[in-house]
UniProtKB/Swiss-Prot annotation:
Pathway it works in: Cofactor biosynthesis; riboflavin biosynthesis; riboflavin from 2-hydroxy-3-oxobutyl phosphate and 5-amino-6-(D-ribitylamino)uracil: step 1/2
Catalytic activity: (2S)-2-hydroxy-3-oxobutyl phosphate + 5-amino-6-(D-ribitylamino)uracil = 6,7-dimethyl-8-(1-D-ribityl)lumazine + phosphate + 2 H2O + H(+)
The enzyme's E.C. designation: 2.5.1.78
Gene Ontology CC entries for this record: cytosol; riboflavin synthase complex
Residues reported to bind (2S)-2-hydroxy-3-oxobutyl phosphate: D91, T92, R133
The organism of origin for this protein: Picosynechococcus sp. (strain ATCC 27264 / PCC 7002 / PR-6)
GO biological process, one term: riboflavin biosynthetic process
Gene that encodes the chain: ribH
GO molecular function: 6,7-dimethyl-8-ribityllumazine synthase activity
Function: Catalyzes the formation of 6,7-dimethyl-8-ribityllumazine by condensation of 5-amino-6-(D-ribitylamino)uracil with 3,4-dihydroxy-2-butanone 4-phosphate. This is the penultimate step in the biosynthesis of riboflavin.
InterPro entries per UniProt: LS, LS/RS, LS/RS_sf
Protein name: 6,7-dimethyl-8-ribityllumazine synthase
Amino acid sequence: MATFEGTYNDNTQALKLAIVIGRFNDLVTSKLLAGCQDCLRRHGVNTDPEGAQIDYIWVPGCFEISLVAKKLADSGKYDAIICLGAVIRGDTPHFDYVAAEVSKGVAAAAFQTGVPVIFGVLTTDTMQQALERAGIKNNLGWGYALSALEMASLMGKI
């Protein structure tokens, strides 16, 4: 029996990535993006928007992330897709609908295409919680980038 495991440094200069970012709550999503870019840069990926390694796609909000991620995955051009967003609970059930649908949609995009689609959408009760998860001490954007690198590596091995 073989054991397969992805790594973070398997020829990262050859990867083609897409990052889909929800513009709603951009105070948070822009910080997640910065953390994601920092991680990718430190692992040898050219994060320049004018470069050839990463396409950045901004969408109005989290609900639109799944559709765009699926279209990108269907294109066959990407080794991994990272989806970044922030859904913050309010006074209505809107939070529940958006959070549920974006998580299902991102998972479906990966299952239906075989392309790693990383779920980097924060679901928090308050803006403060979201900012803490996208801050200097603990920016989850970094972890989402690592997941993309590891999954792209793993999918190339199995």
